[in-house]
């Protein structure tokens, strides 16, 4: 069951226990796990800089061999142990560069995160289990828990080339599989966790790149300012057009609702009335499909209305 996209749940006669559990977590809005690729060094120097960032002074890095290391010298030891200089030399070979492609990544920098309030120790244990199950005896890795922000998160550095000489290629399906695995590892620690696609949950607001997101948090995003100014100008001119991608988003939402309706009917046919009702409320509560431009237009409209109200209430002189 895909809970909204590309599946044939409505043609099944009975849902499996694991599928029912996933549906239940989704409609009851269990915390969603987050896995993102934050980059990856193309040189041993870049990898060392990243280790310096995630290790800092107060954080302890844990290797795939169970070592706990701190300090620059220890981090350099990990890089030497992983033979990254050899990998870097190979990626710069004339045969590799003949196609004009950039040097390949020596490592993948991965972030495993959970919302504020999640026990940090549980996130660390789940991250250890995830890394062990996905990479042990294949790809060298190291991880470190960060608790300097409200949401506990683990930085996981994975060597791109395996011990068997196979390169780790991370695709969209890889990330979906990893999210499900990480959520399972968290639940094994007694932590409520779910891994469902954004569209299936009715989430349509576009995700921001790491750089834009950090700039937004710091209040210095030129991208967001330029987008807001563009929407404001279009609204003033009276020619705010519908974005080309919105029709695809609307089509996706229709497909999501169609499959959720099939699941709802299947639950009722199997006597799962309470869960079917929860599915119905979940779908009814999905926010309207909204592009980034829609979001800006609504925010600007609300702000204009607030300003006018404040002016009307201001005492006259």
Where are these regions (language model features)?
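N-terminal nicking endonuclease/strand-transfer module with a His-rich metal-binding environment
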Residues: 1-317
């Amino acid at each position: 069951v895909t809970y909204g996209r590309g599946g044939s749940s409505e043609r099944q006669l009975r849902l499996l226990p694991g599928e029912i559990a996933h549906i239940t977590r989704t409609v009851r809005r269990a915390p969603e796990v987050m896995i993102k690729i934050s980059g990856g060094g193309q040189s041993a120097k870049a990898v060392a800089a990243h280790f310096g960032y995630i290790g800092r002074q107060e954080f302890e890095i844990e290797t795939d061999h169970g070592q706990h290391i701190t300090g620059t010298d220890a981090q350099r030891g990990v890089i030497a142990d992983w033979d990254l200089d050899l990998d870097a030399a190979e990626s710069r070979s004339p045969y590799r560069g003949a196609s004009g492609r950039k040097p390949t990544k020596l490592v993948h920098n991965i972030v495993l995160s959970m919302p504020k309030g999640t026990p940090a120790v549980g996130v660390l244990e789940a991250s250890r289990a995830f890394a062990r199950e996905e990479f042990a005896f294949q790809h060298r890795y190291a991880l470190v828990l960060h608790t300097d922000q409200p949401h506990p998160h683990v930085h996981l550095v994975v060597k791109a080339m395996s011990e068997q000489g196979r390169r780790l290629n991370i695709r969209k399906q890889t990330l979906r599989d990893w999210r499900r695995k990480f959520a399972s590892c968290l639940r094994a620690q007694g932590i409520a966790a779910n891994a469902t696609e954004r569209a299936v949950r009715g989430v349509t607001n576009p995700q921001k790149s790491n750089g834009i997101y950090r700039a937004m948090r710091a209040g210095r995003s030129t991208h967001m300012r330029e987008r807001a100014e563009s929407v404001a100008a279009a609204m003033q001119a009276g020619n705010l057009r519908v974005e080309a991608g919105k029709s695809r988003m609307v089509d996706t939402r229709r497909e999501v609702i169609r499959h959720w309706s099939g699941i709802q009917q299947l639950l009722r046919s199997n006597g799962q009335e309470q869960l079917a009702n929860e599915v119905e409320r979940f779908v009814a509560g999905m926010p309207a499909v909204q592009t980034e431009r829609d979001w800006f237009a609504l925010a600007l409209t609300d702000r204009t209305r607030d300003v006018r109200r404040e002016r009307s209430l201001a005492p006259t002189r």
